[in-house]
Swiss-Prot record:
InterPro entries: GPC_FiloV, GPC_filovir-type_extra_dom. It holds the Pfam family Filo_glycop. The gene is GP. It is found in: Secreted. It comes from Reston ebolavirus (strain Philippines-96). Keywords: Disulfide bond, Glycoprotein, Secreted, Signal. Disulfide bonds join C109-C136, C122-C148. This is Super small secreted glycoprotein. Glycans are attached at N41, N205, N239, N258, N269. Belongs to the filoviruses glycoprotein family. The lineage of its organism: Viruses, Riboviria, Orthornavirae, Negarnaviricota, Haploviricotina. One of its GO terms (cellular component) is extracellular region. Residues 1-33 form the signal peptide.
């Protein structure tokens, strides 16, 4: 029996060292308020995370600032056919909203008005107080029809739709939005002094006009089968002239395309609809800022004549459609 106890007992010197090490760990944990479970357990409770994050870093919620960050900075495709593939309809999922204090200026924003085949609306009206995203270089305004298989339109990648200082998980009808996420920044607490320093700059008068000093260009589209497997998108030049969009493109390309059609008098001269297609040889990604590093070397050798008629618009591939009450003659 004595030998059995000897196996369980620690030598006196080793026991002292082990006890000292245990006390050091306990005192170390109490000194820095770090939960011991963080070493072996990845699922921490909220209180443990608060102790870990907030000590000497966050002393007040006033140090937290919410910022809206746009997705287009990641280099995602921003043309309407590509963007609409990232959105889908779902039923039975309640929408969620969160406010934010500051945001970026967006290159591309979207504004949707989609109806079902029976004439009913696909998208809900925005709640009271919700306004469109205020800083957009291009607003892609899309009107059309679709099956809309669900109650609300969500982002398939889990991102938010950014409105004016409000982010929502759903798209609201006729309200301009940008795609993005919400980030929370922890600002260092300013040191308190007993005297008040003189401000470095005089206060600047602000305005409630969210569109001041920022030029916004609206591009219009017509879309059919929105929310379906295969959708069709037309760029609207005027009420009777359209361009079929079959490839990813940039808003700058559409602006130049619009100018080319008008400058060369290629608009519909009747009450019928005239639809053009773009020559496949033309690169539609001119001016894309997200790919500037890969494209900037090509600009000095690119001839802008490629965007002039007839190279950018192929008259032999044009699609002519007649609307009721008028014929659309072929352009020469």
């Amino acid at each position: 029996m004595g030998s059995g106890y000897q196996l369980l007992q620690l030598p006196r010197e080793r026991f002292r060292k082990t006890s000292f090490l245990v006390w050091v760990i306990i005192l170390f944990q109490r000194a820095i308020s770090m939960p011991l479970g963080i070493v072996t357990n990845s699922t921490l409770k909220a209180t443990e995370i608060d102790q870990l994050v907030c000590r000497d870093k966050l002393s007040s919620t006033s140090q937290l600032k919410s910022v809206g960050l746009n997705l287009e900075g990641n280099g995602i495709a921003t043309d309407v056919p590509s963007a609409t593939k990232r959105w889908g309809f779902r039923s039975g999922v309640p929408p969620k909203v969160v406010s934010y204090e500051a945001g970026e200026w967006a290159e591309n924003c979207y504004n949707l008005e989609i109806k079902k085949s029976d004439g009913s609306e696909c998208l809900p009206l925005p709640p009271d107080g919700v306004r469109g995203f205020p800083r957009c270089r291009y607003v892609h305004k899309v009107q059309g029809t679709g099956p809309c298989p669900g109650d609300l339109a969500f982002h398939k990648n889990g991102a938010f739709f950014l409105y004016d200082r409000l982010a929502s998980t759903v798209i609201y009808r006729g309200t301009t939005f940008a795609e993005g996420v919400i980030a929370f920044l922890i600002l260092s607490e300013p040191k308190k002094h007993f005297w008040k320093a003189t401000p470095a700059h005089e206060p600047v008068n602000t305005t409630d006009d969210s569109t001041s000093y920022y030029m916004t260009l609206t591009l219009s589209y017509e879309m059919s089968n929105f929310g379906g497997e295969e959708s069709n998108t037309l760029f609207k030049v005027d009420n009777h002239t359209y361009v079929q969009l079959d490839r990813p493109h940039t808003p700058q390309f559409l602006v130049q395309l619009n100018e080319t059609l008008r400058r060369n008098n290629r608009l519909s001269n009747s009450t019928g609809r005239l639809t053009w297609t773009v020559d496949p040889k033309i690169e539609p990604d001119v001016g894309e800022w997200a790919f500037w590093e890969t494209k900037k070397k090509l600009f000095p050798t690119t001839s802008w004549r490629k965007l002039a008629f007839p190279n950018s618009i192929n008259p032999h591939q044009q699609l002519l459609r007649s609307e009721p009450g008028g014929n659309c003659p072929r352009k020469n």
